[in-house]
Amino acid sequence: MREFLKERLPLTEFSEHLRKPLPKHINLLFSLGSLAMFLLLLQAATGAFLALYYSPSPEHAHNAVTYISEEVPFGAFVRGLHHWGASAMVIIVFLHLLRVVLYGSYKAPRELTWIFGVLLLLVVLGFGFTGYLLPWDEKAYWATVVGVEIASTAPVLGDFVAKVLRGGAEIGAVTLSRFYALHTIWLPWLAFGLVGVHLFFVRYYGSSGIPQNTPEEMPSQPIEEGKPFYPHQVFEDVVGMLILFVVLACVALFVPVPLEDVADPTNADYDPRPEWYFLFLFQLLKYFQGPLEIIGTFVIPTVGMVLLLLLPFLDRNERAVLWKRPIALTVTSVSVVAIVGLTILGASSPKLETQEAPQPTAETENTMPTEAVEEAEEVFDFQLTEEEIEGTEEAEEVFDFQLTEEEIEGAREVGESQ
């Protein structure tokens, strides 16, 4: 059997690939990519479990989530792993990209590796946005309303994108169905496709390692070889995965995932808050309102993402050592501080200002009873003064009904008989 498989499967080539040496100067930060992959698989496994009991309709979604949390064996634990695992994945992917920036690992010939990594970050954020609506509680509904409204501010295609996301004029059953399809079908296929391409480039070009403080050691130059990927790096990655899983399991056990009341589209007083990794965008809306709103909702995020994608082509400094790249160091530091600062401010800031309900005018405040009420006053032989109409309970009762012509005629006959 061994010879049969050996002749038909590239086991020798695969073994040689696993034993390919890594750079000599490597540390635990190089396990972040493996941890991100582990979290993606964990999200797929826990999501598949939750999908067995979930129903993507406004009538059943909230009840299904409640049933999972309260009735399904280990349901609350699995839901906790899925929920907190999503946050952990955002953190790990962000730290992984930050490590690549600090070590200059995006430089030639690894430009495509970087681009596919940034695209993966966008997909991870897409998972968070589409999955947020699925519980169909107040927080999920109104945060999605804000998110779709932000998308609608994009020039040219904004209204089209918002309409496609909603599936109509308002968020409802079609919206929930589309978000569920994106979250469970489209984005997973896209994510695993990008991961496959990203891993291919990582293994093809190898890791750049830690840049050394010598002008000769550039990312494009040959790197001093160290220990093989298997078993040394594999062992470190597995240990990191186990530690991460234990941490997530503890959080899932002791920190229940919140679930608010079922979504009420008429509750316009609700203060919508996105998930924490979107709070920096939420806070930007506080500084750019009215005609300037598009700067916070579209211009800054789009420009930032384009610059991130094109970073390998914009950074022409051949040196990889961080302190010899002052521009990259400054831009990275300012960006990280800005994102973290805006996130903290967004978590503690008051709700966005909304347009106040129209206040009564002088004309509406002094409006006299309708024609039917005036006729009723004559029939029942009473006359309310303007002050009584404005301030008494009798005036409120008068305004709370509308007499028909038959009722007025009947009341007149009663009055004449008396």
How does the language model describe each region?
Residues 291:
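Alpha/beta-hydrolase-fold serine-hydrolase catalytic core, especially in secreted/extracellular enzymes
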Residues 1-283, 287, 295-363, 368-371:
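Membrane-embedded alpha-helical bundles that constitute the cytochrome b-like, heme-associated redox core
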